[in-house]
């Protein structure tokens, strides 16, 4: 049985380059089911366990491996050698561990708030979509676009800076 560290390593190394903004959107999307339970039903269930586990691992990776935290800093505590699988020590102090934990909680709270805003802004349409799904058991892209509007186009990355050629002397 593979350890969680090995599985996380496989997940991290199989990913393509992702920006912090893309990860925040992905995390908010993952939390949307739990947020929806709270907004629409007024309670939480155990149904989001897998989502919470994935989000927690992803945010710890953002903070402790990819240096995507201003508070913790641009530093990586990731050990690509695999040596940490055998040792039960962290390559940082308890104070840093607490900073990492605090930052992870703050980032998850921020993504949760993003999901809440999005769901609340689209509550009427989501209710209509849910009713349609209960009625027909399937909805199509056209239904979603009619109810919620067309999907926003993906943001293009910034254009590369043009280079000027110099004449050979």
Name what the model sees in each region.
Residues 1-169:
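Soluble catalytic regions of large protease machineries
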């Amino acid at each position: 049985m593979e350890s969680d560290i090995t599985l996380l390593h496989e997940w991290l190394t199989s990913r393509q380059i992702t920006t912090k903004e893309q990860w925040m959107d992905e995390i908010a999307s993952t939390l949307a089911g739990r947020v929806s339970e709270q907004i629409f039903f007024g309670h939480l269930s155990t149904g989001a366990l897998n989502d919470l586990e994935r989000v927690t691992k992803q945010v710890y990776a953002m903070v402790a491996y990819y240096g995507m935290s201003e508070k913790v800093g641009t530093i990586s505590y990731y050990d690509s050698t695999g040596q940490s699988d055998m040792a039960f020590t962290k390559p940082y102090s308890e104070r840093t561990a607490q900073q990492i934990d605090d930052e992870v909680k703050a980032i998850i709270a921020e993504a949760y708030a993003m999901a809440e805003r999005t769901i609340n802004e689209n509550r009427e349409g989501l209710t209509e979509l849910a009713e349609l799904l209960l009625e027909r058991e399937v909805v199509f892209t056209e239904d979603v676009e009619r109810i919620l509007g067309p999907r926003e186009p993906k943001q293009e990355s910034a254009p590369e800076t043009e280079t000027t050629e110099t004449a050979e002397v």
